[in-house]
């Protein structure tokens, strides 16, 4: 049976050594053995468990729920793979529709075809948005209801270019913050503060009003409390959710 060190495991799977250490620390993926020299060693069963973790992450499952699923008594790997295949196939179909919308939108912007406005949002998941809004209202009450209404009112006038820029900026902020995390930058460092300044502006655009410091810090708490946000950020980089939230609170304190 093949045995892998943590570096070999990282090269084989594409998961960083830092992430594997994090998974070990939280009990999600413990090495099969630890040598007298402190080296972690993994076997094929560990590879299959890591594969499961990555499938769950692709499906935006929160880390704590992944661990609960994998550690349940009588866990059936083959059954889990079949269920994941079904969900991934459905997701692939939705992504294919989104790719088609991207292509048609680009063709519209470049003057090659005219795209009806009603087709701009084909392929997006209205159920997911509805779940997110319901969660906000449940946890934050009437204030969340008002903010959702304000945001929707502001976005009604957005065109294709507005939506594209909004989404690209969100991805850029997440990418830059994940890079800061891997570099070990403090949340109140100048580079992270600059990223948070961009996020502050992005949130203001999303809400159709400038956030207060308390509201901005509260949004950071929401990122940690809401499973869908947690799944999104942890899929980008392990530990990003907490880092993002702390950076937002640090920025809010300085406003």
UniProtKB/Swiss-Prot annotation:
- InterPro entries listed in its UniProt record: DNA-bd_dom_put_sf (IPR009061), MerR-type_HTH_dom (IPR000551), MerR_fam (IPR047057), TipA-like_antibiotic-bd (IPR036244), TipAS_dom (IPR012925)
Q: Ranges for the HTH merR-type domain?
A: 3-72
One GO molecular-function annotation for this sequence?
Answer: DNA binding
Keywords associated with the record:
Activator, DNA-binding, Transcription, Transcription regulation
User: Could you tell me which Gene3D superfamilies the record lists for this protein?
Assistant: 1.10.1660.10, Antibiotic binding domain of TipA-like multidrug resistance regulators
Residue range(s) of DNA binding per entry: 6-25
What does this protein's UniProt record list under function?
Regulates the induction of katG (catalase-peroxidase) in stationary phase.
**What name appears for this protein in its UniProt entry?**
HTH-type transcriptional regulator SkgA
The primary gene name is skgA
């Amino acid at each position: 049976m093949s045995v892998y060190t943590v570096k070999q495991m990282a090269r084989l799977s594409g998961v960083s050594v830092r992430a594997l250490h994090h998974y070990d620390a939280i009990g999600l993926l413990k090495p099969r053995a630890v040598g007298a020299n402190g080296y972690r060693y993994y076997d094929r069963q560990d590879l299959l468990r890591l594969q499961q973790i990555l499938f769950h992450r692709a499906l935006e499952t929160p880390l704590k729920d992944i661990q609960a699923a994998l550690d349940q008594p009588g866990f059936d790997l083959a059954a889990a793979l079949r269920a994941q295949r079904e969900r991934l196939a459905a997701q692939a179909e939705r992504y294919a529709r989104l790719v088609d919308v991207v292509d048609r939108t680009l063709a519209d912007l470049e003057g090659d075809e005219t795209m009806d406005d009603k087709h701009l949002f084909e392929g997006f998941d209205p159920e997911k948005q509805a779940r997110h809004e319901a969660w906000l209202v449940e946890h934050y009450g009437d204030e969340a209801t008002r903010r959702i209404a304000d945001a929707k009112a502001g976005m009604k006038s957005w065109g294709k270019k507005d939506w594209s820029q909004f989404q690209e900026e969100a991805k850029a902020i997440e990418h830059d913050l994940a890079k800061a995390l891997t570099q070990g930058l403090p949340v109140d460092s100048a580079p992270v503060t600059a990223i948070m300044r961009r996020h502050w502006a992005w949130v203001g655009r999303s809400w159709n009003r400038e956030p207060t410091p308390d509201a901005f810090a509260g949004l950071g708490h929401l990122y940690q409390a809401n499973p869908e946000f947690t799944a999104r950020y942890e899929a980008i980089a392990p530990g990003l959710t907490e880092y993002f939230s702390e950076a937002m609170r640090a920025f809010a304190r300085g406003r």
